[in-house]
């Protein structure tokens, strides 16, 4: 029996499923869980709602996110291993739930965002006086 094809990411319910499933994995991850849970604490509902808006804006043009996503991450105790694990979990979640052009866009955007965050966090740590978000 052939498995049913997965849908592409098309509407807000898909964004909620992606974000909630992904962050469920992050919260329970041996490497990432303590960091995220320690910083977010009991504010997970608010964080998830913000991530729904962020990924909804990035992937399906909802236009509901405003903010600067890099700023909250600058002082987090994270490095290459953390970004690598974040990407593993994100890509696995996308692939478990979806397939299609927007799912591929999610992969590309996550890769670009992780690369940019790592580069800017490193610049901020080594030369904060020169840092421009």
Language model features with spans:
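Core of compact, soluble alpha-helical bundle domains
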Residues: 1-133
């Amino acid at each position: 029996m052939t498995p049913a094809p997965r849908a592409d990411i098309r509407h807000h319910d898909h964004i909620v499923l992606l974000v909630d499933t992904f962050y469920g994995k992050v919260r329970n991850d041996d490497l990432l869980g303590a960091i995220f849970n320690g910083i977010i604490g009991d504010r997970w509902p608010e964080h998830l709602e913000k991530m729904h808006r962020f990924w909804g804006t990035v992937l399906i043009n909802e236009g509901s996110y405003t903010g600067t996503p890099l700023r909250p991450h600058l002082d987090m105790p994270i490095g290459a291993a953390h970004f690598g694990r974040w990407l593993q979990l994100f890509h696995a979640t996308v692939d478990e739930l979806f397939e299609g052009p927007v799912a591929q866009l999610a992969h590309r955007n996550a890769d670009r965002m992780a690369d940019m965050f790592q580069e800017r966090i490193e610049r901020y740590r080594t030369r904060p006086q020169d840092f421009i978000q």
